[in-house]
Amino acid sequence: MEIVNCIGKKGDTNFAILYPSLRSNKSLVIELIKKIRKNHKTLVFSNSHLSAELIAFNASKQGIKIGIHRAGLLPKNRKMVENSFKNGMIGVLSSTPTLELGIDIGDVDAVISNLVPVNRLLQRLGRAARKGQEGYAFLTLGNDPISQYYKNHPADYFVDEEIPYIDPFNPIIMENQILAMCFDRPISKLESKEYLETLSKLQRKDLVIFNNGKYTPTNSEKQNVLKNYSIRGIGNDVDILFNGKIVGNRNLPHALEELHDDAIYFLSGRRYKVKKLILDEKTERNFADIDTIPINYPYYTKPIREEYPQVIEIFEEKEIFGIKLKYCSLNIYKKVLGYSNIEIGKEINQGKKVFFNDPITYTYATKGFIFRVPSPKEILKMASEKEKIEASGYHATEHVLIEGSSMLTGGASQDIGGISLGDTGMIVIHDGSIGGNGASKSLFDKFELAITRAHSILIECSCENDDGCPRCTYSYRCGNNNEYLHKNAAIEVLTRIINRERTTILEFNNFQQTLI
């Protein structure tokens, strides 16, 4: 064996961090693409499906030849986009993290990235200038709480490292992995002790049998269960149909929010309208039928939803400042009540609301933690609508805790949901995946720093609106149309936490309105 040491060919890369004080993040990105694309192949990274699709959609409207690469598209379509970019047929590619590593897309001259932890940013920027040419790299901040924080504390960005999070005990993953183990080699009674609960579930589903002291698959046809299992997501998929053909898919529970009836869905830079969402619990055959809409249709949609939590089992407890936190397993009862129409090109998080006659309901098991925050007593002394102001303060607190801690938890805010339980002060922060993904545990472990950072974001934001603004209290994931928010009440809540005001966790079953 011969070990070869050498230095790879890598050109100098010019790097800039940009903060859009007078425009939206998407407008800034489009302007960068227009300036760079003529002589430089450009890769644009977004952190969500919708952001990547909106970049491609808006760029196409301005005459830019751009492809899109993300999960949920058919593999053959992703491969076609990769080859088109590699061969120079398109000069700009809008992508989610699917292109961060491991896929050959040829030479890249410029990289534009939304906000991610610094070690992931370096991975993205490493895509540029690999053939020795001069490269260009841009980190574009946005109109959101964590971007506002880094604008005021830029040095913190370079010390906030990504800590990978995972939940190895996710029951969905365990069932599929242990079933695969049985196909590989029967599991003996002796080695099955730590898997007994999962093996019992597989037995009840008639996937394995216990015979002659070993667990074996019931028959070879059960391998079809594994063929339908994807490491890209957890839980069942919803197939997306156009003219009777599958053109993509989306995981539950996220599919409920993006593929409900009349939702506007972005696919490969184009917009479609969902004619009907079908969820068949018996056959697990789930699909959404989509159709084209006029090019000049002015809106896209965001869901209006409610969620109700149920605590199943407490795993861990601790106290931060005067707040008790309990990490636990949960059932989340989700309702999609309707949607908001958001005007294309407008950087707003509120829109005209449409409600369904029959809300879509779905229940899933996950993990998260619960806690109770103190009441904003001083604000309430002057308030005429005390219950509304109090609930709005707790809702804003929940938003900024999740959005503002994103880089502390390795960007986990995208995989986290939050529920504020009316005017009780009870807040639930949970994993957004069926069975759990470890994201909320990451925030649970760094909760003290999350509190102080959330407090800084609110007091440093110059807006004077009662409900705050996109840079402090708003969340693009809000299920309540970014309504019922109160910035000053949230500041008082967080100040009281930092001053170690103690609270007691309440038992909860049925509260009035929840805010998410």
Regions found by a protein language model. Give the residues of each.
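Conserved phosphate/anionic-ligand binding catalytic regions in large, soluble enzymes, centered on
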Residues: 127-130, 464-474
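Extended Lys/Arg-rich polyanion-binding regions
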Residues: 134-137, 143-160, 175-191, 223-464, ...
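Extracellular/secretory pathway and lumenal proteins
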Residues: 5, 473-476
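Acidic, low-complexity intrinsically disordered tails
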Residues: 497-516
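ASCE P-loop NTPase motor cores of helicases and related translocases
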Residues: 31-39, 476, 496, 515
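Helicase motor core with emphasis on the C-terminal RecA-like subdomain
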Residues: 1-185, 192-225, 234-235
